[in-house]
């Protein structure tokens, strides 16, 4: 249901998104404000991070950086997480959206994002749709 909620831009009322935001705030409060917090996620996890940053000032104030990978990002989701100009300016400094060209889950992120910086990577030319979405695109490296 969370995937559907973000697909149509109603994740604010989705219990999974609400729970994730509360859990994130609770974890940060338990460790204190003197820590350097960062958020990360892939696919739905990346969408959770974007939603948390747009919806919670207490999370936003504590987080120093965000790196997300092929987040679920649709036009309705985009419209639902828009923030005011001042907040956008703050989030543009913290949020980095990494996506593979041709990934359909993060497809709208190549057009525009509500905030943050987009880094786009090329997939192997023989990659199928699942290959383009996998986190392996960002973790497989030659040693």
Listing of model-derived features with the role each one plays in the protein:
Residues 1-39, 56, 60-65, 80:
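A conserved cap/lid and substrate-binding interface adjacent to the catalytic center
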Residues 60-143:
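The feature captures the conserved acid-bearing segment of alpha/beta-hydrolase catalytic domains
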Residues 9, 34, 42-43, 74, ...:
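Compositionally biased, intrinsically disordered low-complexity regions
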Residues 41-45, 49:
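Gly/Ala-rich beta-loop-alpha elbow adjacent to hydrolase catalytic centers
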């Amino acid at each position: 249901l969370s995937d559907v909620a973000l697909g149509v831009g109603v994740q604010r009322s989705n219990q999974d998104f609400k729970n994730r935001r509360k859990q994130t705030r609770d974890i940060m409060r338990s460790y204190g404000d003197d820590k350097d917090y960062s958020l990360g996620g892939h696919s739905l996890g990346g969408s959770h991070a974007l939603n948390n940053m747009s919806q919670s000032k207490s999370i936003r104030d504590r987080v120093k950086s965000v790196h997300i990978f092929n987040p679920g990002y649709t036009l309705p989701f985009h419209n639902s997480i828009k923030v005011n100009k001042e907040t956008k300016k703050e989030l543009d400094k913290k949020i980095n959206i990494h996506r593979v060209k041709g990934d359909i889950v993060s497809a709208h992120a190549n057009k525009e994002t509500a905030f943050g910086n987009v880094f786009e990577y090329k997939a192997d030319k023989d990659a199928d749709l699942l290959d383009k979405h996998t986190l392996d695109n960002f973790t497989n490296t030659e040693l």
